[in-house]
């Protein structure tokens, strides 16, 4: 059954009962929004302009920054619209589209996996690095990661169009999440309970296992290096990536746990966890790489001091 076009739009709620402080909350979100745009935008400009950053690792970082910007662009305008302008209504199609674009979380997981592969190649077979990760191969990997994310979530989103919706039109958050929308469906939603578990297991959690295995091999290689200074230099290459992996997967597991087992948790807990999941990684990723990657630090200095690019 196709969803009822005559049914009213969904209503975004969010921080119910705290309307008096919506302005303060929105200002905090606006600062985070600006920081995400500035941080990831600056990273993209650096990689675009600085020829010394035209290497596979930085191309993958550019993909990560693009993904973080996409997540933010599709979430924050809706959030700010609810908090500042009280624009709570959202059409079914717009809601489903927003849920679809949230598949960028799976894309981000794939990019973090690819960055682990990049680190693995750089440390295990450094002399063959440029032969293995050619520009065409980097492009194909990026397209593959993007297609995997979108295609894996497509069955869930298409199923949303097939359900009738009745009863309350209120959604828990200030943006559309599949876990939230499906609760309003008046039909058998067994598929929408089982498929996300399989999907997440075969993408995000499998990616995490492969990353762990790759770092076990990386550590074995590094421990075989005679010089302690060279060990530290090799590991420092991957510290920023490990930090981003931890940030992403901790927030994913937190959000999944809350939606699966936190039915009796206070209203504000799942809402806060969803914001942490969608905003914290895009906020900290450029900071982590700027602090831990010397090439990016030098590029930032050249950019803001007006020096010629490498």
Swiss-Prot record:
CC annotations in GO: membrane; plasma membrane
PROSITE patterns per record: G_PROTEIN_RECEP_F1_2 (PS50262)
Keywords linked to the UniProt accession: Cell membrane, Disulfide bond, G-protein coupled receptor, Glycoprotein, Membrane, Olfaction, Receptor, Sensory transduction, Transducer, Transmembrane, Transmembrane helix
A GO biological process held by the record: sensory perception of smell
UniProt xrefs under SUPFAM superfamilies: Family A G protein-coupled receptor-like (SSF81321)
Protein topology in the membrane: Multi-pass membrane protein
Keyword Ion transport set for record: no
Bilayer-crossing regions: 24-44, 53-73, 98-117, 137-157, 194-214, 235-255, 271-291
One GO MF term: G protein-coupled receptor activity
CDD domains: 7tmA_OR51-like
Topological region Extracellular: 1-23, 74-97, 158-193, 256-270
Disulfide bonds: 95-186
Domain of life of the source: Eukaryota
Glycosylation site residues: 4
Cytoplasmic side, ranges: 45-52, 118-136, 215-234, 292-310
Location in or out of the cell: Cell membrane
One Pfam family per UniProt: 7tm_4
InterPro entries: GPCR_Rhodpsn, GPCR_Rhodpsn_7TM, Olfact_rcpt, OR51/52/56-like
Chain's role: Odorant receptor.
UniProt family annotation: Belongs to the G-protein coupled receptor 1 family.
Protein's name in the database: Olfactory receptor 51B4
Species this protein is from: Homo sapiens (Human)
GN (gene name): OR51B4
């Amino acid at each position: 059954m196709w969803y009822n076009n005559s049914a009213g739009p969904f209503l975004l709620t969010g921080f119910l009962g705290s309307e008096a402080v919506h302005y303060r909350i929105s200002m905090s979100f606006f600062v985070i929004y600006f920081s995400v745009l500035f941080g990831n935008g600056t990273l993209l400009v650096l990689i675009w302009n600085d020829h010394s950053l035209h290497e596979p690792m930085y191309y993958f970082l550019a993909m990560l920054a693009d993904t973080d910007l996409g997540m933010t662009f599709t979430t924050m305008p809706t959030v700010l619209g609810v908090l500042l302008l009280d624009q709570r209504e959202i059409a079914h199609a717009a809601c489903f589209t927003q849920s679809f674009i949230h598949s960028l979380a799976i894309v981000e997981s794939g990019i973090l996996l690819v960055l682990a592969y990049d680190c693995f190649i750089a440390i295990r077979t450094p002399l063959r690095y440029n032969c293995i990760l050619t520009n065409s191969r980097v492009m194909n990997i990026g397209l593959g990661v993007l297609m995997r994310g979108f295609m894996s979530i497509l069955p869930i989103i298409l199923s949303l169009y097939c359900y009738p919706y009745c009863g309350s039109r209120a959604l828990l958050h200030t943006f559309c999440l599949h876990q939230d929308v499906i609760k309003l469906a008046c039909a058998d939603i067994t598929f929408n309970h089982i498929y996300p578990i399989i999907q997440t297991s075969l993408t995000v959690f499998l990616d995490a296992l492969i990353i762990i295995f790759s770092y076990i091999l990386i550590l074995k290689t590094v421990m075989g290096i005679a010089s302690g200074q060279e060990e530290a230099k090799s590991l420092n290459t991957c510290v920023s990536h490990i930090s981003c992996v931890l940030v992403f997967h901790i927030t994913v597991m937190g959000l999944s746990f809350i939606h699966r087992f936190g039915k009796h948790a206070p209203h504000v807990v799942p809402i806060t966890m969803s914001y942490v999941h969608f905003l914290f990684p895009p906020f900290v990723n450029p900071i982590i790489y700027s602090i831990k990657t010397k090439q990016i630090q030098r590029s930032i200095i050249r950019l803001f001091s007006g020096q010629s690019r490498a």
